[in-house]
Design a protein with these regions (language model features):
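Short glycine/proline-centered loop/turn elements that form peptide/ligand docking sites
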Residues: 77-78, 172-183, 216-218, 240-241
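C-terminal hydrophobic helical "lid"/dimerization subdomain
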Residues: 279-333
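NAD(P)H dinucleotide-binding glycine-rich loop of Rossmann-like/cofactor-binding domains
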Residues: 81, 90-152
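Mid-domain Rossmann-like dinucleotide-binding core that forms the NAD(H)/NADP(H) cofactor-binding site
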Residues: 126-197
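N-terminal Rossmann-like NAD(P) cofactor-binding module of classical short-chain dehydrogenase/reductase
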Residues: 89, 210-211, 233
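Glycine-rich beta-strand-centered segment in the early N-terminal region that forms part
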Residues: 22-39, 52-97
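A short acidic, Gly/Pro-enriched loop at the edge of an enzyme's catalytic core
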Residues: 202-209
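Glycine-rich phosphate-binding loop and adjacent beta-alpha segment
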Residues: 218-296, 332
Length: 333
């Protein structure tokens, strides 16, 4: 089959190539999926750059990509939830990445029937951003009436998170560029801060939750607007100190994580708030929940642009440019 493989770390043009590789061999708990569409996420170009070498070690070359939608070709003897012909969508784990390909074999617990009312391209846009939001909100026990600040509301995660937060009954503030103000309001944002018209730090705060999708200075600055007793949950900041313990990391990695996160923890202590970082895990049950939200009209996938399969390097570069409104999708079939 054809698949894009990562053969080293660095520039996209130098290390992402289309190759002929062996078809995946599914195990007894796996489903073999013919991929019709895959979506891109920032973690993909960060992986290419080598940003994740400390926390995710891969033997290269190897296929990569996390999100996919397609048709089940076969199911293992114990993969009784699915049958050939089922239209499904899935999120691969760190160990099973490889959705920028014509086929993938995944454990059945990573897979769900795709929402019935949408296309494969729209379904492929949902898994990582949807699971990230559901798992993140569950971890901080988000509930109706709380005030949440969602950074980058027009991005892939932001467009899903705004809709899901509104579904739960949270009071939603988001940041975006002035050209996207009406767009994020249409998704359900109560208040919008246009970052090209003013500094969000000067717009007040006292948020119960800050959902940090940007990292860098935004992670530390989040503690200037979160309320005492609140929580900053980050997808892009440094790993929290529990991460190394959860991963069973050695002392060298634990020291590295401590050094990476020291500024964040200092800001957290000063603000009297909690810092939470996590890596999303595949979850077919939650994908079924998301499918119900989509079919019920609570969530609508947002696609900025679709690229042909052979254009993955261009699609990664486009996403890395930071101007996508919603998700970038790869049409495999």
């Amino acid at each position: 089959m054809r698949a894009f493989v990562l053969d080293g770390y660095g520039a996209i043009a130098d290390h992402v190539r289309l190759a002929e590789i062996a078809d995946p061999v599914p195990g007894p708990d796996d489903v073999l999926i013919e991929i019709h569409a895959a979506s891109l996420n920032p973690i993909d170009f960060k992986l290419v750059r080598g940003d994740l070498k400390r926390v995710s070690k891969y033997q290269l070359p190897r296929p990569f990509g996390f999100d996919a939608a397609g048709i089940v070709l076969s199911a293992g003897a114990r993969a009784i939830r699915f049958k050939p012909g089922d239209a499904v969508y899935a999120r691969a784990s760190r160990e099973t990445i490889g959705t920028f390909a014509e086929k993938i074999a995944l454990p059945q617990e990573f897979v769900a029937l795709k929402p019935a009312a949408i296309s494969h391209a729209e379904a492929a846009a949902l898994p990582l951003v949807g699971l990230t939001t559901l798992q993140g909100f569950a971890r901080v026990k988000a509930q109706a009436g709380q005030r949440i600040l969602i950074h980058a509301g027009a991005g892939g995660i932001g467009t899903f998170a705004i809709q899901y937060a509104r579904h739960l009954g949270l009071d939603v503030t988001t940041t975006t560029s002035s050209k996207n103000v009406d767009f994020v309001k249409s998704l359900g944002a109560d208040r919008v801060i246009a970052y090209d018209r003013g500094n969000y730090l000067e717009q007040g705060g006292d948020y119960d939750i800050v959902y940090d999708t940007l990292g860098g200075a935004f992670t530390v600055d989040a503690f200037k607007v979160v309320k005492r007793g609140g929580v900053v949950i980050s997808l892009s900041g440094p790993p929290d100190r529990d991460f190394a313990r959860r991963e069973g990391a050695g002392w060298l990695v634990r020291v590295a994580v401590w050094l990476m996160s020291r500024k964040v923890y200092a800001a957290s202590a000063e603000a009297g708030a909690t810092y939470c970082w996590f890596f999303t895990e595949p979850n077919g049950d939650q994908l079924r929940e998301i499918a119900g939200l989509v079919d019920g009209g609570a969530i609508k996938p947002v696609i900025d642009r679709e690229f042909a399969f052979e254009q993955l390097p261009a699609a990664l570069s486009y996403l890395e440019g930071g101007r996508a409104r919603g998700k970038v999708v790869l049409k495999v079939r």
